[in-house]
């Protein structure tokens, strides 16, 4: 299994293999998920004090806050996967 890394802004990098979803923080259920992760000590704030624009939920139950738009993170993720399949057509 290859480790794929995604830049989530300000030099912060997350393992793409561990990402379950990338969502906007605006809805009440997502705000509740953020608060529950904060209470459980599973929240990683990678916003550097800026406004949270994307919430990344990982398979380890960690919740990561990013100041980058969800579309940008998703685009980086899909571009990374596309470049990996282009490099290794034997898979």
Swiss-Prot record:
InterPro entries: RemA-like. It comes from the Bacteria. Signal peptide: none annotated. Pfam families: RemA-like. NCBIfam families: MtxBflmRegRemA, PRK04323.1. Belongs to the RemA family. This is Putative regulatory protein DSY2730. It comes from Desulfitobacterium hafniense (strain Y51).
